[in-house]
Structure formats: C-alpha cells, structure tokens
C-alpha cells in the first residue's frame, strides 16, 4: 500500500539508505540493556533498607554489573562496525547546525556508553569487600576486577570507591540528558520536519 502525502514517512529522503542489520541490532540491543540497567540501578538506589533480602539485593546489583560489562563489549563491537561500515548520510536538506548537533550528540553518546561501564568497573574494583565477593558475569563466568586497584590499601580503595561511584552517577545523569536530546531530535525530524530518519534505524 503506497504511503499517502500525509504520512510522516514521506519526504525528500523517503528512500534514504538504512543502517546495516548488524548496526541496527547493536543499536537496539545496547539501548534495551541500558534501559534495563537504569531500572536496576534505581531499584538498588531507591528501595528502603530491608525492602529486599540480602540475596535479592545482591542479585540486582550483580545483574546490573553483568549488563554493564555486556554493554561495554557491545559498544566496542558497535564502534568497530561503524569504522568499517559507513553509516547512511543525513538528508541533504539538514542545515549545518543540525548536522553538527547530531554529530556532537552521537559522540557524546559513545563517550558516555563507554564511560558508564568503565566507571562502574573501577567503582566495583575499589570495593573493599571485592576480594571476598567474586564477580560472575550473569552468574556463569568469573569476571576480573582491575588488579592494581584491588592491591591498594583499604583507605585508598575506600576513597577511590566513593570517587568512582560519584563519577558513575554523574555519567548516568549525563547519559539521561543526552538520550533525551537524541530521542527528541529523532522525533522532531520524524514528526515535525517529516524526514524519515527513524526508518534508517528500524529493524
């Protein structure tokens, strides 16, 4: 069935090239895992003491860590794929400032997607109880902490644990803001400007 002239998918770029299937899969998988981790992080942070058993809290936190490491691995694959597979160009009618804004938002997203799990890994490695609480990726494979941090004295580790935790939290809020701008920009182009940019990233 042909699209009508009123369809938000009709425009000068209606036939725009799509991202590759691998890029689309990585994009939505990373997005889903990040949203899941946001929910798990909020559960761990906002639930009052005693709301969950120690075992349940440990499960939530360990799952949060496992997803974070998975996101880091997928982000590396995403960057490697992008470097070897040129993404489709933005529509020619986009003004320069929008092109620059889109590029800046993508760079910020990549930086934060790496910074979040890395800061979390550093935070976890500086935990004073890390040596007696091995980390297992989804309960299956033991994941190493960062050795030189674990070998520091307890006072230094406690200080670093707090600092890396604050950095992890700051990165999370920055990621929320950039994601909100990214989504708002995509919806603006789709529904107001009538450019079919969303279709490029749809499965």
Where are these regions (language model features)?
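Membrane-embedded alpha-helical bundles that constitute the cytochrome b-like, heme-associated redox core
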Residues: 1-203
């Amino acid at each position: 069935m042909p699209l009508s002239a009123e369809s938000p998918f009709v425009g000068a770029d209606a036939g725009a090239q799509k991202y590759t299937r691998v890029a689309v899969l990585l994009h939505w998988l990373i997005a889903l895992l990040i949203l899941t981790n946001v929910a798990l992080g909020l559960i761990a942070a906002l639930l009052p003491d005693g709301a969950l058993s120690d075992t349940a809290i440990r499960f939530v936190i360990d799952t949060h860590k496992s997803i974070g490491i998975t996101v880091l691995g997928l982000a590396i694959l995403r960057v490697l794929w992008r470097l070897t597979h040129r993404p489709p160009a933005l529509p020619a009618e986009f003004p320069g400032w929008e092109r620059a804004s889109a590029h800046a938002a993508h760079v910020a997203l990549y930086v934060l997607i790496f910074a979040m799990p890395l800061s979390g890994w550093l935070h976890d490695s500086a935990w004073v109880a890390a040596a007696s609480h091995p980390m297992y990726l989804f309960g299956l494979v033991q994941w190493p902490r960062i050795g030189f941090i674990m070998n520091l004295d307890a006072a230094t580790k406690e200080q670093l644990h707090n600092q890396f935790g604050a950095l992890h939290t700051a990165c999370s809020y920055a990621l929320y803001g950039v994601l909100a701008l990214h989504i708002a920009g995509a919806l603006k182009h789709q529904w107001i400007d009538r450019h079919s940019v969303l279709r490029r990233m749809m499965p």
